């Protein structure tokens, strides 16, 4: 997590147009950048509902900015933005506070479990701190493509991060999933090593 105050100060001083993606913000208890809209009008905040609510098939999200900025963006929006299903889903998801609390607790438990599995694997050199529902991992003695191939028979997918800035082919991103998915990964790593 970056120091948002520090970044915003720098960006505002340079009069940058700022787009902040808060799609993973629900996984942690960090503040939104929305408060900066009161004093800075070149800010856009994007939020996808598919991340926290595990609804990849439903393309629902929001963009928050000043009234003027939203009016400018409206000329580019599609005629049919949301289906009735999407709209109902969005409303139900936002109203369900219990889901949010339970999901956070389950994600934390499963992430700790996943971290412990990875720490005990000789394939892993380093695990980086994450507030989201995935872990960035540096592999010890194989590259991302080799790791993907070794995990394929177990139907486990990891994200090759070699095309991310400052990362090479030894970095993968592993999603935090269920406890049973963690057990499958643990078994796979034990058999691969």
Model-predicted regions and their roles:
Residues 108, 121-154, 176:
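Conserved PLP-binding catalytic core of the aspartate aminotransferase-like
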Residues 153-154, 165-193:
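PLP-dependent enzyme catalytic core of the Aspartate aminotransferase-like
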Residues 1-18, 22-52:
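Active-site pre-lysine segment of PLP-dependent enzymes
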Residues 3-7, 33, 114, 147, ...:
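A general structural detector for well-ordered alpha-helical segments in enzyme core domains, enriched
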Residues 37, 118-119, 151, 189:
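Hydrophobic C-terminal alpha-helix "anchor/cap" residues
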Residues 42-120, 125-127:
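PLP-dependent aminotransferase class I/II
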Residues 57, 131-133, 166-168:
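Short acidic/glycine-enriched loop/turn segments that link adjacent beta-strands
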